[in-house]
């Protein structure tokens, strides 16, 4: 548990004590089960301990947009209520989630222990990181064509890396929902990118040739 970013630099004994103080609970969800139905007024913070989930939004026609993929160490819940009340979190594999009440984060316990301050700092770091990632996603979505959206997203996946390949974190259907594009049009554009020699595709492995 102490290897999670939210508990960074906090001793394992202090982590266990805080979880008990916070009345934290672990819940297990099967694939495709809804973990949270909306992020507003949930009053909880969730941390993915194992498995994966998607943060999703559905419009009035039932069209899905994937906001973010959540993996081990990802945080969600009340801290992301600014995204709106129509955001849900859905398990994409069997997963285990740790929950605790948001009020324990913002209200100091009577002891005002140092580990509580460190926890708050860690959450703020996670929030800052997520805001940067969401802004990068908005930049990708602002591109006019499906081709530019794909290449913009691919560039994000290799950002800061020496090699120029990656494994898609989504299925192709999920990727289309993440980029807010038609799946058939997206697959045609991926085919065009392959034929133009810009990318090489082997299953979910994609190599950027530029």
Regions found by a protein language model. Give the residues of each.
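Cyclic-nucleotide recognition modules
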Residues: 66-124
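Phosphate-/nucleic-acid-contacting segments
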Residues: 155-210
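Short acidic-glycine-tyrosine-enriched beta hairpin
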Residues: 11, 30-33, 59-76
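Long, hydrophobic or amphipathic alpha-helical segments
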Residues: 117-120, 124-134, 138
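Glycine- and acidic-residue-biased ligand/ion/polar-headgroup-sensing regions
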Residues: 43-56, 72-73
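A short beta-loop-beta micro-motif enriched in histidine and acidic residues
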Residues: 21-22, 32-45, 63-64, 82-85
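Cyclic nucleotide-binding regulatory module and flanking cytosolic helices
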Residues: 1-31, 75-76, 80-82
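N-terminal positioning helix adjacent to the helix-turn-helix/winged-helix DNA-binding module
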Residues: 119, 142, 146-149, 171
């Amino acid at each position: 548990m102490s290897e999670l970013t939210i508990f960074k630099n906090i001793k394992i004994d202090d982590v266990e004590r805080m979880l008990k103080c916070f009345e934290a609970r672990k819940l297990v969800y099967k694939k495709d089960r809804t973990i949270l139905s909306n992020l507003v007024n949930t009053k909880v913070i969730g941390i993915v301990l194992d498995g994966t989930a998607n943060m999703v939004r559905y419009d009035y026609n039932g069209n899905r947009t994937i906001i973010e993929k959540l993996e081990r160490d990802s945080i969600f819940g009340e801290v992301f209520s600014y995204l709106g009340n129509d955001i849900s979190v859905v398990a994409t594999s069997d997963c285990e989630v740790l929950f605790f009440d948001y009020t324990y984060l913002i209200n100091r316990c009577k002891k005002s222990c140092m580990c509580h301050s460190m926890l708050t700092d860690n959450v703020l770091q996670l929030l800052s990181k997520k805001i940067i990632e969401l802004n990068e996603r908005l930049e990708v979505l602002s591109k006019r064509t499906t081709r530019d959206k794909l290449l913009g997203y691919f560039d994000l996946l290799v950002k800061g890396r020496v090699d120029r390949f990656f494994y898609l974190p989504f299925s192709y259907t999920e990727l289309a929902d993440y980029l807010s594009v038609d799946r058939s049009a997206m697959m045609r554009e991926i085919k065009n990118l392959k034929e133009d020699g810009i990318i090489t595709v082997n299953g979910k492995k994609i190599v950027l040739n530029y």
